[in-house]
A protein has these predicted regions:
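Asp/Glu-centered strand-loop micro-motifs enriched in Gly/Pro and often flanked by an aromatic residue
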Residues: 34-59, 72-78
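Short alpha-helix boundary/capping segments
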Residues: 110, 115, 310, 340-344
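Short, solvent-exposed loop/turn segments that connect beta-strands within catalytic domains
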Residues: 79, 290-294, 398-400
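Extreme N-terminal leader/anchor segments
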Residues: 1-41
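Carbohydrate-active enzyme catalytic cores, enriched for enzymes
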Residues: 166, 194-327, 331, 372, ...
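Aromatic-lined, polymer-binding surfaces characteristic
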Residues: 56-236
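Catalytic micro-motifs at enzyme active sites that drive phosphoryl/nucleotidyl and oxygen chemistry
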Residues: 104-109, 305-306, 339
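CBM-like, beta-strand-rich accessory domains located in the C-terminal region of large
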Residues: 56, 135, 332-517
Length: 517
């Protein structure tokens, strides 16, 4: 039985505004909804080993107990004692049923991220009720969070561990835990975020998550009575440029790595150049800020795949005229399935795939670039297939056009192009594919054209969602030129010497061209 706390060991820093929204009355009846999956009736005698959807994220959310923490927040907001009583009973039941040394306990109960997310909920509860079991559990959580062998340095989980350790340390009056948390999160931020703001987890969505969580961390540090380290403040500020440039004109983050295609990033400052090269492995370009019809593109290079990254090096995405054109398969989920594994493979991205054996984790070099107001070009190379493959990307604005030349030193390659699900094939032939959405058209041209293929594919418009999409494969060759012309239905192309002229709706565009490509 919980009893009202009259004394505390230290200050309770309750981060209740960070708990997810819930349907309070449903939770009071024992029904929960996590990660957009159908509701589950837990009842009053919760089976903590349950995972009815067989979903890793669902199980994590169950054991994180942030949904119970939200009941505490609702009690604080409304004064309704039933909410606090329900949260107290749920957390007491979890503590009783999930001792670390008991066989058969869910592996998610003491997973490092579950511990980090759950501890702040226990702290919030401790502001209103107190039992030996709750205090013992807080101490146990603190010991785990302080354990260097369980710490995820340079990872978003590590940041959550530090936030949790800080608030537990303050609650239990253990200043050494608070100080350890601040030291670790500062060192971890400098490892995870480079001076330009690129997060080494290789997914813009995680840049957004870490930025938000660092904001929580800075607030918790101040509430603890300490001064936030300026090094930590600076790394959080640096993230803002990376997030802003990774945000497409439609307000959604570009779906690179484990970034859901429907994730939004609003409100970030975006002054400065419209094209920026981030040495951590990204080129982001657009024609204008704050214009939903702006052209936009991304290019991937840099260190090999790590953490939340995909095998997307040399990959591009492209928007123009208010339309998504080239997309990638994107992020589906954290489930361990063949499809999810495929979404992380080169074949799920707009890249040249060389005939041969792929060598994962290879870095890609940005060899050169030329950035002008209406035309930019970039050259990249790597040896991901044991042989040098090179990609040259040219993007033109006004008129809009993207041209990509892929080549391999030995052997052959095929370039893959994944189109937005809104686009359907209107016509095809002779190395040309015209796609459309309503009356709007975009044309893909291949040189050489013989052997081009069009296949049905799948992309992920959101978490656990798939949509049918068109995938175009270039002919197999040692070198292939791909030209994307937005707003055009089979534009005329002419060649004179080593110059190709593409007659777009906005006017002619000239490209360097070799008959041998």
């Amino acid at each position: 039985m919980f009893w009202r706390a009259r004394t505390t060991s230290g200050r309770a820093i309750c981060l209740s505004d960070q708990f997810p929204g819930i349907k309070v009355e449903e939770v009071m009846r024992g029904r929960v909804t996590f990660v957009g999956l159908p509701p589950v009736d837990l009842g009053t005698d919760v089976d903590w080993t349950a995972n009815p959807h067989g979903n890793r994220s669902w199980a994590l959310n169950l054991h994180a107990l942030r949904w119970a923490g939200r009941l505490v927040a609702e009690y604080e907001r409304t004064g309704e004692p039933a909410y606090l009583d329900s949260a107290s009973a749920l957390i007491a039941h979890w503590i009783r049923e999930n001792p670390r040394d008991r066989p058969g306990v869910s592996p998610w109960a003491w997973a490092e991220h579950a511990v980090a997310l759950r501890a702040p909920a226990l702290v919030c509860l401790s502001e209103h009720v107190r039992t030996p079991a709750l205090w013992d559990s807080l101490a146990e959580h603190g010991e785990i969070l302080a354990d260097p062998s369980l710490y995820r340095q340079g990872h978003n989980h590590g940041l959550d561990q530090d936030i949790a350790l800080l608030v537990v340390g303050c609650r239990l009056g253990r200043a050494r835990w608070r100080d350890l948390a601040i030291r670790r999160m500062t060192a971890s931020a400098e490892l995870a975020i480079d001076a330009q703001g690129v997060l080494h987890e290789q997914a813009p969505r995680y840049g957004l998550y870490v930025h938000r969580r660092l904001g929580v961390a800075l607030r918790a540090i101040r509430e603890s009575g300490a001064e936030p380290p300026q090094r930590l403040v600076a790394r959080r500020a640096a993230l803002e440029a990376y997030i802003a440039h990774a945000t497409q004109p439609d307000g959604r983050l570009v779906s690179i790595g484990d970034s859901p295609a429907d994730a939004r990033a609003d409100g970030f400052r975006h002054e400065g150049p419209v094209v920026r090269v981030f040495e951590g492995g990204y080129v982001f370009g657009r024609t204008a800020w704050d214009d939903p019809r702006s052209a936009y593109y991304s290019i991937r290079f840099g260190p090999g795949r790590r953490l939340h990254g995909h095998e997307d090096h040399l990959g591009v995405t492209y928007m123009a005229q208010g339309r998504r054109i080239l997309v990638e398969a994107g992020f589906h989920s954290y489930e361990r399935t063949g499809f999810v594994e495929w979404t992380r493979s080169p074949q799920a991205h707009n890249v040249p795939v060389v005939t041969g054996v792929f060598k994962p984790g290879k870095a890609t070099r940005l060899i050169g670039s030329s950035i002008g107001p209406s035309r930019q070009s970039f050259e990249l190379a790597d040896d991901a297939y044991g042989v040098t493959r090179t990609r040259r990307v040219l993007v033109g604005h006004g008129p809009d056009l993207m041209a990509v030349h892929d080549s391999v030193a030995r052997g052959t390659l095929r370039s893959l192009w994944h189109f937005d699900p809104a686009l359907e094939v209107v016509s095809r032939g002779d190395g040309r594919v015209v796609l459309g959405d309503g009356d709007w058209r975009v044309t893909l041209l291949h040189f050489p054209g013989a052997g081009q293929a069009v296949r049905p594919g799948l992309v992920c418009p959101g978490y656990l969602r798939t949509a049918e999409a068109v995938t175009v494969l270039s002919p197999e060759a040692a070198g292939v030129l791909t030209v994307i012309v937005p707003g055009a239905d089979a534009p005329r192309v002419s060649v004179s010497g080593d110059v190709m002229t593409v007659h777009t709706p906005g006017g002619p565009v000239q490209l360097p061209y070799s008959q041998s490509t």
